[in-house]
Each structure stands twice: as C-alpha cells, then as structure tokens.
From Swiss-Prot:
SUPFAM superfamilies: Glyceraldehyde-3-phosphate dehydrogenase-like, C-terminal domain, NAD(P)-binding Rossmann-fold domains. NAD(+) binds at residues 70-73, 143, 180, 190, 193, 230-233, 281-282, 306, 309, 340-342, 355, 393-394, 422-423. It catalyses: D-glucose 6-phosphate = 1D-myo-inositol 3-phosphate. One of its GO terms (molecular function) is inositol-3-phosphate synthase activity. Its cofactor is NAD(+). It is found in: Cytoplasm, Cytosol; Nucleus. GO terms for biological process: inositol biosynthetic process; phospholipid biosynthetic process. Keywords: Cytoplasm, Inositol biosynthesis, Isomerase, Lipid biosynthesis, Lipid metabolism, NAD, Nucleus, Phospholipid biosynthesis, Phospholipid metabolism. Signal peptide: none annotated. Plants silencing RINO1 show a low phytic acid phenotype in seeds, and high accumulation of inorganic phosphate (Pi) in seeds. GO terms for cellular component: cytoplasm; cytosol; nucleus. This is Inositol-3-phosphate synthase 1. The gene is RINO1. It comes from Oryza sativa subsp. japonica (Rice). Highly expressed in embryos, but transcripts are undetectable in roots, leaves, flowers and anthers.
Length: 510
C-alpha cells in the first residue's frame, strides 16, 4: 500500500512551528582487542548513544548555479525541471509522454514506514522531511561557451524534438555567465567552445565567481544557493607541500597565480569563502587537502566526487552481491564508448586518467570486507576502458565482464551490456545532490553530553549514494556498496523524525 504522507507520534519527537526535534537512540558496537590467559581475543560490546536531532522545516527558495550549465547535463536538467513545472507533454513514436522525475531518489523512490493489516506500507522518500520542490528551483551558472540554453539543448541531442520545440521559449533567454578556462586542465579539443571566459589572474577569476554568486542571489531573490560542477573532467592536480596541502598554502598559491591550481578548485574556494555548498560532479581531485582544510575551518558543505549514474552503480551492486554471497570476483573488465562532449574530452589521456581512478576504486571496500576470500593486499584485476565514438552521442554503451572463483575451483563469468542514456541518468542525480545538500544544511545534531547543536561534518558523506568516489572526512572509512549508502541516507533522515532504522527483521511476523 502507498501513502502520500505521514506524521510520527512519539514522546521522542516534537513538531514545532519551524523545526522538528527528535531524541534518538543510536545503537552500535565498540571493539576491544585484549589479551586473556596468554591469548589475544576480540571483544564486541553493544553500545548505545543518545542523539538529539533538530531540523529546520522552513523550506527556502533555492538557487542552483551549475558550472558547465550549457553542457548536456546542465541543459537537460534545466529543461526537465521546466517541463515538470509547466506540465508539458510531448509526442514520441510510442506514446504521448508526460514530464516526470524518474531516476531521482528524492522524487521517485519510496521508503517503508511499517505494515498495516499484513500489508507493507510505503511512502515517498521526500515525505520524510520537508524538502525544496524541484519545480521551484531557480537556475543559473557558468560555461566557457556563450550558447544559450535552448541552443545548448539542441546541440546536446538528448531530448525529443517535440519537447525541445515546446521548451525553447523558456530557455532562449538563459545564457551562461563567463567561466574559468584553463586549457592545461582539459582536453585541447575543448578550445573551440571557449568563447565565454573570465580573464585575469587566478585570484581575479576567483573573485569574479564570488561576485557572480552574490549578484545571482540578489537578482533572483533566492534564500540559498548551491553550486555544482558538471563541467568537463579535469586532469588530476599535483598535490605538493607548500602549494595546496594546507588552507594557508592554497590561498597563498592563488595569490601567487600558481599554475597548478585548477579551475574547479577556484570555484570551490569561492563557494567556501561565501559559505555556499559546492558539489563536484566530475572525477578530478578538486578537493585538494588545502581546500578540505578550508571547508572544515569555514564549516561549509562540500561533496563529491563524480556522478554515479550507470556502469559504476551496477558494479557497486553486483560486486557487493558476489562478495556478500561468498563468491570471489577475480577479474573485472569495464568497457565504455560514448559520443557526447564528455566522451570527446575524455579522449585525452590526462583527463581519462581522472575517470579511470574514480571508476576503478569503487570495489575496494567490498573486497577488503572479506578476508576469507582475499588475502591482505589481494585485489581483483580491474581494467577500465573509455572510447569516443561520435555517432552514438549521449547514448553511452557500457560492457562489463566479471570473472569469479566459485565452489571447488569452478569459475563463473557474468557479462553485462548496459545502454546508459548519459545525461538522462545524470540529471536526476544532480537534482538529488542539490536537494539533499540543501536539506543537510538545515539539520543539526548533538550527542549525549554535548552542550550545543552542530551541523554535520562539512565533508558531506550523506551524499555518497550519488557519487562514484565518495568524499569522506579524514580518518573515515569509504563505503561504496550501494545498498549501504542508501541505507545510511535513509536511516539518518528517519532518525530526524524519531524512526528506527529499517532493519528488515520483521519480528512481528516471526
């Protein structure tokens, strides 16, 4: 059964005029390694900690500024939100299609809230806590191309022609602000697009981004802004002592116009200085140590890296299943070809390397979780290949072969072919990242014994379900298994309204 909304009634939850407060018992374990009678042993002790959560329920008018607004992802997301807001329908060869938010965790998925008369009851994910309605988002952003969003949508060749014709009047007036362009960080083939760039030193470019954010916020009358990078994949930046290893060194390097400070890092610095959440949707190391240091000191949300949309999402499910079933993956070979501008940019070796790292590390935590299958340091052979084939456009092909060892020396091979409509998968993920980033800035918590409420750690692990290479605070384990990531996100939101984690025990029927 499906219900549209619900309200929690509990002595541990209080609904106020502008906030929800919950008193929550967090049950976990602590491990101790000790010696006993001359032998060492592990002791696992159940542990309970009480937390108070406070969530502001006033939903702001939210502005979204996309770096790479005129790209396939930016134009597709903008078009999709307008189509939903205006209730647009259009003819395809199969049927009359209605605008929707399919592919969005927040808008098109559900959560289990209990059972009634022997039937499972589900509610929209977005009903857990008050969220921004995506129809109300205000878009802006930057691009190194000055093409308006209507023409960018046409260039992308993602949406049906009938839909494009209806959207054009809404998008023709949307023109990206000039962006930061550094040909050293992206493929040389992107130079032909670069007719809309910010001139000057790196410090002057960063200051212009700050000015742009302030002017956008003032002109659009939004309460909050979230900035997200959906521009070209950059090459990795060199991390060097004295250059970008600390907050002080990073800012000094910007002042000195050091060449190794990337455009994405400049955008991120500008956002952190303004207290604006910044999310990196590409695989490069935007968040160098000095930037993470800066974000922590300024208590400003940062999240990333790289949208998890197609092949990697499948991989994080399948390998988790195999290892969890006691099956040993020994070889993972992933091949992609695509023909959009992302593929064109990734045809350069230095930018492909960023993507290769992002896609290759996704199974690490699953492998390390099972020392029965893998010895220390052992890892499956893992190869990632990406090729540029212009004809296929945004319709990315992904082919994977998984070879595993099974019972008594047997071998198992799984082969997948996945046609990933690249931007149509990425756009709702961008939407979720923006909405969840904003929501997380309205949540505060304090543990038992703490005097004051505080926000989540600025490095937003809550967004990890949506990213290939989740950014985590120093010393925090990286979790890539998709089911664990979704459970973490859902259970934190459940805690905010005093609901227990969904443990699937269903003891009432046992």
């Amino acid at each position: 059964m499906f219900i549209e909304s619900f309200r929690v009634e509990s002595p541990h939850v209080r609904y106020g005029a502008a906030e929800i407060e919950s008193d929550y018992q967090y049950d976990t374990t602590e491990l101790v390694h000790e010696s006993h009678d001359g032998a060492s042993r592990w002791i696992v002790r159940p542990k309970s900690v009480r937390y108070n959560f406070r969530t502001t329920t006033t939903v702001p008018k939210l502005g979204v500024m996309l770096v790479g607004w005129g790209g396939n992802n930016g134009s597709t997301l903008t078009a999709g939100v307008i189509a939903n807001r205006e209730g647009i329908s259009w003819a395809t060869k199969d049927k009359v299609q209605q605008a929707n938010y399919y592919g969005s965790l927040t808008q098109a998925s559900t959560i289990r809230v209990g059972s009634y008369n022997g039937e499972e009851i589900y509610a929209p994910f977005k009903s857990l806590l008050p969220m921004v309605n995506p129809d109300d988002l205000v878009f802006g952003g930057w691009d190194i191309s000055n093409m308006n969003l209507a023409d960018a949508m046409t260039r992308a060749k993602v949406l049906d022609i009938d839909l494009q014709k209806q959207l054009r009047p809404y998008m023709e007036s949307m023109v990206p602000l000039p962006g930061i362009y550094d040909p050293d960080f992206i493929a040389a083939n992107q130079g032909s697009r670069a007719n809309n760039v910010i001139k000057g030193t790196k410090k002057e470019q960063m200051e212009q981004i700050i000015k742009d954010i302030r002017e956008f916020k003032e002109k659009s009358k939004v309460d909050k802004v979230v900035v997200l990078w959906t521009a070209n994949t950059e090459r990795y930046s060199n991390v060097c002592v004295g250059l970008n290893d600390t907050m002080e060194n990073l800012l000094a390097s910007v002042d000195k116009n050091e060449a190794e400070i990337s455009p994405s890092t400049l955008y991120a610095i500008a956002c952190v200085m303004e207290g604006i959440p910044f999310i990196n949707g590409s695989p490069q190391n935007t968040f160098v140590p000095g930037l993470i240091d800066l974000a922590i000191k300024n208590n400003c949300l940062i999240g990333g890296d790289d949208f998890k949309s197609g092949q990697t999402k499948m991989k994080s499910v399948l390998v988790d299943f195999l290892v969890g079933a006691g099956i040993k993956p020994t070889s993972i070979v992933s091949y992609n070809h695509l023909g959009n501008n992302d593929g064109m940019n990734l045809s350069a070796p230095q930018t492909f390397r960023s993507k290769e790292i992002s896609k290759s590390n996704v199974v690490d935590d699953m492998v390390s979780s099972n020392a029965i299958l893998y010895e220390l340091g052992e890892h499956p052979d893992h190869v990632v290949v990406i090729k540029y084939v212009p004809y296929v456009g945004d319709s990315k092909r992904a082919m994977d072969e998984y070879t595993s060892e099974i019972f008594m020396g047997g071998k198992s091979t799984i082969v997948l072919h996945n046609t990933c409509e690249d931007s149509l998968l990425a756009a709702p993920i961008i939407l979720d990242l923006v909405l969840l980033a904003e929501l997380s800035t309205r949540i505060q918590l304090k543990a038992e014994g703490e005097e004051k409420f505080h926000s989540f750690h600025p490095v937003a692990t809550i967004l990890s379900y949506l990213t290939k290479a989740p950014l985590v605070p120093p010393g925090t384990p990286v979790v890539n298994a998709l089911a664990k990531q979704r459970a973490m996100l859902e259970n934190i939101m459940r805690a905010c309204v005093g609901l227990a984690p969904e443990n699937n025990m269903i003891l009432e029927y046992k």
